[in-house]
Amino acid sequence: MGHVNNAVYLTYCEMARIRYWSEVTGEPLAAGHHGAESLILAEARITYRAQVFHTDVVTVETRATHIGRSSFLLEHRLTACEPGGEPRLVAISESVMVRFDYTVGRAARLDDRFVAAMESFEGRRLREA
């Protein structure tokens, strides 16, 4: 065998979305006040294209493609290569993230400053009108 378990691909995406959020917004993924609010994963979809082997170097390219009232969609493109080798596409994934207010137990509107940071980073409008 020598390949990683399929669940590991989702872990790669998790690490990528945590890094994306902190680099784009300057905030940790738990973006609420004293833990009352945070971003939660509402949905994850993945299409596997090829195996990832234990010795491979994996890269995840992440971008935001859509922002709603309380959620946003991230797309992930996963590539892998042997050290010194050519990258190959191994998976494509989408993650739906929702801002959740634990105090009231439901989704909360995304803060405009986070929307502005994501749109600035992506260089285009992402929020639906």
Whereabouts are the PLM-identified features?
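Hot-dog-fold acyl-thioester-processing enzymes
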Residues: M1-L41, D101-A129
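Short coil/loop residues immediately preceding or within conserved phosphate-binding loops
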Residues: L41-E43, L73
